A protein has these predicted regions:
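Solvent-exposed loop/turn segments at secondary-structure junctions
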Residues: 194-198, 252-254, 273-276, 300-304, ...
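Bacterial N-terminal signal peptides that target proteins for export
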Residues: 6-25
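Ser/Thr-rich, Pro/Gly/Ala-heavy low-complexity intrinsically disordered linkers and tails
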Residues: 41-115
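Active-site core segment of subtilase-fold serine proteases
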Residues: 115-265, 273, 281-314, 322, ...
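Loop and turn regions of beta-sandwich accessory domains that flank beta-strands and are enriched
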Residues: 507-694
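C-terminal subdomain of the subtilisin-like protease fold in secreted/lumenal serine endopeptidases
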Residues: 123, 292-298, 332-333, 359-360, ...
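Extracellular S/T/G-rich loop segment that most often corresponds to the catalytic His/Ser-adjacent loop
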Residues: 193, 354-438, 442
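C-terminal motif of bacterial Sec signal peptides marking the signal peptidase cleavage site
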Residues: 33-35
Length: 694
């Protein structure tokens, strides 16, 4: 969902945040392809089947074998439907009125039936899915592929994999939450994505009524393509949502596959990305907010450097407000969003206005060694990270260790060891939130990020980027969760399921939407030039200089001290009036417009700018860093071009969580801006700041 209306910006809408490994050989295209890949790795690569007793479901053509099955895990399959993607009888046991996928049994791996089957996928799709067939007994037993799920329990090694650099304990600490009796029972999680294979053998026991199919015969058509209640994959590229669903809530103890973080939570699927329409995404974000608890969004704007505000921000904000104020009987639904995968090309999470809006839990990614995954975008909007793939070797980083990706469910009753990106980290946090809500169903949408931040686990402790703030949960009563630590790489740290559940149990709620205070917006008209200083490159860029220019800006962004205000530039201060009595900030929105030198148009190269916000406590949020941008050429390739979109752009800020608006008599919030690239200049026209909290 983007701010611009021309064809380039429109087609960049709603991209999944999983990095398709087959595309990563071209660094310049990484951020676009990472966002546009639609679902991930080559379907025939790194797929594994559960080593179970019995038969395996037939694959393409019904030959009984699965492409890319890991050595030693092949089963003997019975015939499938004889069509590519044919699904086995007995793969769904609908509940209720029989028209919706429901909480079914943990289905068989093979067998056949002569009973009539109803097609639930669109006839024009390459993959075919059916419902119906005989009910089968539940399987029991351990999940054989759980040993591959290092992100659940990291022992420092992985059987059958050649890995180095793994660090024991760099995981979700989920076993501690499970030991407290939390598995997600009674909590419903909606997967907003490209598709969800609700008939998957390791998902369908947790699929509950309420999924919705958004696929249409054409973008403007009113007719749904396929069954209205089955958001099924259409092609092999539509595997992203099914991988997300497995991370959240693959069924545990059924003798097959993997285990989700919340393995007894309910799942529904909304394939709202099928048509890349804003209206579908907005509808999905508030569909059944009276029944669903968590909405997982492993997607966002294309990771190509521009400032992408939501298309029709008023409608987007209104939609979120409905979910926050009306969902769960006024407690509010929980929205998780992926921070983005473009860091390797200089992209920055706060430049995607969709994932930094008020009420969103923005999720970054670490690796199995406990450091930032090199693609995971930094920002002042991050809440917590979760462990995901590293991909340093794939990205061409010399000397990097070989670290594992994420194991989860894949299409056609298969499993993959190659899920990655902030797409994989986000459903882990969604699963942890489900465990928290089971522990305390009265938690509001405001409570959840506070608990996540206070209970998060600090990683990369030797990094100089950490800053701390002490904010007692109960005044005068020191506690274990009083100190909040923030890092622009990691947000408040890595999500800690065990600690989050413990803190949730006796948490005193701060209330929902009706009790949250708002101060502002406080607007300042500046209309002054942004000075050039400490230039790292020069505009305009000749084609022969594009790669050197790109590298110079990325290196400049990496070298910045994110806890220092932008130096030698323009400063502008807002003094917050005494009528604003927020003592605990929960969210800040800074809206900013930069123009060209004469003020007649937008800034000619907004990626040149280093922009920061400093609080009365002295803490700094880096809103934007020098970075390159990409634009499409006539032949469809990408090239370096000027960064656009910094007009009335909303920066969402989480970094000042639990700080006061004022420190004694100091009520000044200072914006600083410096142009770090020589040659094209502009002005700061105006900016405003709005505070939310209590």
């Amino acid at each position: 969902m983007l701010h611009r209306t021309d064809s380039f910006w429109s087609r960049s809408v709603m991209k999944t945040r999983h990095l398709p490994v087959r595309h990563l050989a071209t660094p310049l295209l990484l951020s676009l392809l990472a966002a546009c890949g639609g679902g991930g790795a080559n379907p025939s690569a790194n797929l594994v089947s559960a080593p179970v007793n019995g038969t395996q479901a037939g694959g393409a053509g019904g030959n009984g074998s699965k492409p890319g099955v890991a050595p030693g895990t092949n089963g003997t399959g019975s015939a499938g439907s004889g069509q590519a993607g044919g699904h086995q009888p007995g793969s769904s046991n609908p509940a209720g009125n029989g028209s919706q996928p429901g909480a079914g049994t943990s289905g068989n791996h093979g067998g056949s039936s002569d009973s009539p089957r109803e097609r639930v996928s669109w006839a024009g799709c390459k993959l075919n899915y059916f419902r119906g067939g005989p009910a089968v007994a539940d399987r029991t037993g351990s999940d054989p592929n759980q040993t591959r799920q290092w992100y659940l329990t990291n022992t420092g090694s992985l059987p059958g994999f050649s890995t180095d650099g793994m660090v024991a304990g760099e995981d979700l600490r989920v076993q501690g939450a499970w030991d407290q009796g939390m598995r997600g029972e009674g909590i419903r999680i909606a997967v907003i994505d490209d598709a969800l294979e609700v008939t998957h053998e390791d998902l369908r026991a947790n699929v509950v009524a309420g999924s919705h199919n958004y696929r249409r015969l054409s973008p403007n058509a009113k007719t749904i393509a396929g069954h209205a209640d089955y958001p099924m994959p259409c092609t092999e590229d539509n595997d992203h949502g099914t991988q997300v669903g497995g991370v959240i809530a693959a069924r545990d103890g059924n003798g097959i596959g993997v285990s989700g973080v919340a393995p007894r939570a309910g799942l529904v699927g909304f394939n709202a990305l099928a048509n890349s329409l804003t209206e579908d995404a907005l509808d999905a974000l508030v569909r059944d907010i009276d029944r669903n608890h968590v909405y997982n969004n492993s997607w966002g704007a294309a990771d190509i450097g521009h400032f992408f505000a939501p298309d029709n921000k008023a409608a987007f904000d209104s939609t979120l407000n409905d979910g926050l104020s009306k969902g769960r009987d006024g407690l509010g639904v929980i929205y998780t969003f992926a921070a983005g995968n473009g860091a390797f090309d200089g992209d920055y999470s706060s430049m995607d206005g969709t994932v930094s809006a008020r009420g969103i839990v923005t999720v970054c990614a670490t690796n199995a060694a406990g450091t930032r995954a090199p693609y995971s975008e930094r920002g002042p909007n991050l809440t917590v990270c979760a462990p995901s793939a590293d991909l340093s070797r794939t990205l061409g980083i010399e000397g990097a260790p070989t670290l594992p990706d994420v194991s989860t469910t894949a299409l056609q009753n298969q499993y993959t060891d190659s899920f990655n990106g902030t797409s994989a980290a986000t459903p882990m946090v969604s699963g942890v939130v489900a465990l928290m809500l089971q522990a305390n169903p009265k938690l509001t949408w405001r409570d959840v990020p506070l608990i996540l931040a206070r209970s998060a686990r600090q990683v990369d402790a030797k990094s100089s980027g950490w800053r701390s703030h002490n904010s007692p949960i109960v005044e005068g009563q020191p506690g274990a969760y009083d100190t909040l630590r923030y890092h622009h790489d990691y947000g408040f740290g890595v999500v800690n399921a065990d600690a989050a559940v413990k803190l949730s149990r006796n948490w005193q709620s701060v209330g929902g939407s009706s009790t949250q205070k708002q101060c502002g917006p406080f607007t300042t008209r500046v209309n002054a030039p942004i000075p050039e200083a400490d230039a790292v490159a020069t505009n305009p860029v000749r084609k022969s200089q594009a790669e050197a220019f790109r590298k110079a800006l990325i290196e400049a962004g990496n070298r910045i001290d994110y806890n220092q205000a932008a130096a030698n530039g323009l400063t502008s201060t807002v003094s917050v009036p005494e009528s604003c009595q927020i003592t605990h900030i929960e969210h800040i929105e800074v809206t900013l417009t930069a123009s060209n030198a004469d003020g007649s148009d937008e800034h000619p190269s907004a990626g040149d700018l280093h922009i920061t916000l400093q609080s009365p406590l002295g803490s700094v949020s880096t809103l934007s860093v020098p970075h390159p941008c990409q634009l499409p050429t006539d032949n469809g390739s990408m090239q370096i071009g000027p960064c656009q979109g910094l007009q009335n752009y909303p920066f969402g800020v989480r970094r000042h969580l639990e700080e006061p608006v004022a420190q004694g008599s100091n009520r000044n919030w200072t914006l600083s801006a410096t142009d770090r690239v020589a040659g094209e200049t502009g002005r700061l026209k105006d900016w405003s700041i709005t505070f939310y909290g209590r």
